[in-house]
């Protein structure tokens, strides 16, 4: 990798290493703001063997892109559909870490009886994005004296509680730490864990960490739930992992909540959304499995990607409609106009194993997370 410079991205279509014409036609494109993409379209019929097929009419499966990549630590790859949506099926937005060395997979949702994609009908884009390693700036814990309704339930309580701000209880304009008191059109489950504490300012709460620290090779910060959350069959649940808000003066960075490859492949889709400053984090989990699924306490359910302010303009804020998990992103939104900090150089190679730098992650999992 060093011979190409620190900003190089190594790419090896599997067909290069095997000496044959592969299943995918791959082209390089430069989008607005200097963003670099790979545009893939299947040149042959591609088999589709779904692992999840409930009674929703949809099947979920993984499709190999016959591609391996090695990126600098300050880059990730976004797997998504092209702007022109393919008819009848959906490429679920995915996130690839810089340390992943295995074959890249796309998670595809297709009509239940689909078993292959005819030549030229499956199109997938890989967008390379420079990211920030700085964790998001969050507000301080909330005082129980100000908001006694946030006191955690007794140990014998009923478990998950609906977030109280949906009822407008925290909308007092005179309190600077009040959560946004606007409705989002559906119920929302607070999945954090609160512990009462004594502080120099009086009674308060300590909230368990909802956004885990990330390693150098990780693209995003894992988002965990601290209580069990059940997503109904063929339905949705809006999850709020923390009571903390993103600081209003968070700077030029933008925070995006994206799904995890392992959950996407199981038919539990996180609707991509942008987390706006001054708001709490909330996102939709859409269950296509046909049976209720419980996310256990401590489960990693989504990822928080911190990037430039205009990095992903096609991911809207407050994206709280479950069916939008099946939307092909991007659609109808102009390209980014922000210049990447370090525009990447794509290098195609047939000596990937020899030229790619070592990685802690290796070939584990199939993209952003392990299975």
UniProtKB/Swiss-Prot annotation:
**Broadest EC class?**
hydrolase
Q: Which residues form a coiled coil?
A: none
Residue numbers spanned by region Disordered? 350-371
Q: Which one GO biological process term can you cite for this protein?
A: dUTP metabolic process
The catalysed reaction is: dUTP + H2O = dUMP + diphosphate + H(+)
Which sites bind substrate? 260-262, 366-367
Please provide the record's keywords in A-Z order. Hydrolase, Magnesium, Metal-binding, Nucleotide metabolism
Which molecular function terms from Gene Ontology are attached? dUTP diphosphatase activity; metal ion binding
* EC assignment: 3.6.1.23
Which InterPro entries does this UniProt record tie to the protein?
dUTPase-like (IPR029054), dUTPase-like_sf (IPR036157), HSV_DUT (IPR034745)
Comp. bias (Gly residues): 362-371
Q: Which cofactor does it need?
A: Mg(2+)
What family is reported? Belongs to the dUTPase family.
Q: What is this protein for, i.e. what is its function?
A: Involved in nucleotide metabolism: produces dUMP, the immediate precursor of thymidine nucleotides and decreases the intracellular concentration of dUTP to avoid uracil incorporation into viral DNA.
Under the heading HAMAP family, the entry gives:
HSV_DUT (MF_04031)
Protein name per UniProt:
Deoxyuridine 5'-triphosphate nucleotidohydrolase
Name its species.
Human herpesvirus 1 (strain 17) (HHV-1)
Its taxonomic placement starts with: Viruses, Duplodnaviria, Heunggongvirae, Peploviricota, Herviviricetes
Gene name of this polypeptide:
DUT
